[in-house]
Regions:
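Bacterial Sec-dependent N-terminal signal peptides
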Residues: 1-27
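Sequence signature of WD/YWTD-type beta-propeller architectures
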Residues: 22-488
């Protein structure tokens, strides 16, 4: 057995797991807790429609603080260790500064007479971001999966609501809400346990589906919806969690078996392509290409686990998909070779314009959130060139991500800072693939992230609000039988 891993399966853990323009600021990533402001909004690029960047100063012993924010003739002055904007005032400032930079200047007087002066800028991009973000709020523990909720936030302001929660689902575990190409009318998520199912939001209707069968190794786990809305591609996984005894590592998760399946939502059918269900290969994390003509997924050779866990490395694969017949091709190709890069890939996501694919790279394995070395990587699908993303990545886990509908922004979950709590960060991508220093989701309360003891899990962008809420989902859990799917 691999030294350092306890091969101990804990049921509660299992439920948790399944269940470059002129003037633009590219900046540098910093995880230094001694930064003068928090959140770190210094020298970032933001969309013109983002909510106010409220923040506070981090110095000890502040006696007096003044912040001056200016753009041309517009000047705004804030006194005190917090800078909290009125929404309309902020929106007017962003609209006037679109395509240019806003200047920030602060003077801090500390106990003992010391004075600190700080200056920085925020660049305002004219590329709007999709106005809604969904995420799962969950405690970052191993055995805690109760009181889980999926929330939807308008990121143009601070309005937020639950679209599924523990209170309406008998404290069920639920898995994260994903959209197809950031479409509010095409999304899905799971409610696990008794009376649960996959909830498919398509064309104004929400359906409750049973995406499982005795012939499959498990119910569906990870996946994505085809751009047409007719199909879904999913993995079926036997997931094993184990604890490290090494002090610098916490939890290791791996699959002992995993295959891919195609769901036909029109015919209520599941298809298992033989080429994507080999016993000697572990296949997982499937997604569709932007045009729906291909499937990208991660694959690794089967091996003895957990003994060989540090040898388990996944490559990024591609196979054709016939969207008329709902069938895959027979000749998968390697897009990113794990042996060549000496790493392991997971969470691929294609940009809606078809130009980029972003994915997470770890040293090994397939469950990266407790791997501090995890970083985001992006490939140009037209040229095969890998983009340098040093400005985005940190010294903590940077993992799940999703694209905006115009392919100009992406959001990702990062544990930068304390290494425990995931927060949603945003970055801009220009036509050449150049990315900007990320900024965390703004909050009305500038102290919220220090006080919040839950992770923002699987952040996913959307071009509008979904047409359901926690109460309607709860009613479906209680009263609606899940539609059965037959394996063909």
């Amino acid at each position: 057995m691999q030294k350092g891993i306890l091969n101990k399966v804990i049921a509660a853990v299992f439920l948790l797991l399944v269940c470059a323009s002129c003037g633009r600021k590219y900046g540098e990533v910093s995880t230094n807790s001694a930064l003068p402001i928090y959140p770190d909004y210094m020298d970032v690029t933001v969309p013109v429609n983002i909510a106010p960047l409220n923040f506070h100063y981090t110095y000890d012993g502040i006696r007096k603080a003044r912040t001056v924010v200016s753009y041309k003739d517009a000047v705004h002055t804030f006194d005190g260790k917090e800078v909290v904007w009125e929404l309309q005032q902020w929106k007017q400032l962003l609209a006037s500064a679109q395509g240019d930079s806003i200047s920030f200047s602060s003077e801090i007087r500390l106990k003992g007479g010391k004075k600190e002066t700080i200056e920085w800028e925020v660049y305002v991009s004219g590329d709007k971001i999709d106005p809604y973000l969904s995420y799962r709020l969950i405690e970052p523990g191993y055995e805690v999966w109760h009181e889980v909720e999926i929330r939807e936030r308008c990121i143009e302001n601070f309005e937020e609501r639950a679209i599924s929660d523990w209170k309406n689902t008998n404290n069920s575990c639920m898995n994260c809400h994903i959209h197809s190409q950031a479409r509010a009318d095409l999304s899905m998520f799971y409610v696990r346990g008794k009376n649960g199912g996959a909830f498919l939001n398509r064309n104004g209707e929400v359906r409750k589906l049973a995406l499982n069968d005795k012939s499959l190794i498990s119910g569906t786990v990870y996946g994505e919806i085809h751009p047409s809305g007719r199909y879904g591609v999913f993995s079926t996984n036997i997931i094993i969690p184990g604890f490290h005894t090494q002090v610098n590592k916490r939890l290791e998760v791996y699959d002992t078996r995993s295959d891919l399946v195609i769901a036909d939502f029109d015919r209520n059918e599941l298809k298992v392509p033989e080429i994507l269900a080999r016993k000697d290969v572990l296949e997982t994390f499937p997604v569709f290409s932007a045009d729906g003509n291909s499937i990208y997924y991660c694959a690794a050779d089967s091996m003895t686990l957990p003994r060989d866990i540090e040898k388990l490395r996944y490559s990024l694969m591609k196979v054709g998909f016939d969207k008329e017949a709902g069938r895959t091709g027979q000749n998968p190709e390697v897009i990113w070779d794990a042996s060549e890069h000496n790493g392991s890939v997971c969470h691929p996501k294609c940009s809606p314009d078809g130009k980029w694919i972003m994915y997470t790279v770890a040293d090994y394995g397939t469950f990266p959130i407790w791997h501090s070395e995890c970083q985001l990587e992006m490939m140009n699908l037209h040229t095969g060139e890998i983009v340098n993303m040093d400005v985005v990545n940190s010294d903590r886990s940077d993992t799940y991500h999703s694209w905006s509908s115009d392919s100009r922004w992406f959001v990702f979950a990062s544990k930068r800072g304390d290494g425990k709590y995931g927060r949603p960060y945003f970055s801009h991508v220009d036509e050449n693939g150049r990315v900007t220093k990320p900024f965390v989701l703004p909050q009305e309360d500038p102290w919220l992230y220090e006080d919040c003891l839950r992770s923002f899990n699987i952040p996913d962008l959307s071009n509008g609000p979904v047409n359901f809420d926690a109460e309607s989902i709860g009613q479906m859990v209680r009263e609606v039988e899940a539609a059965r799917f037959a394996v063909k």
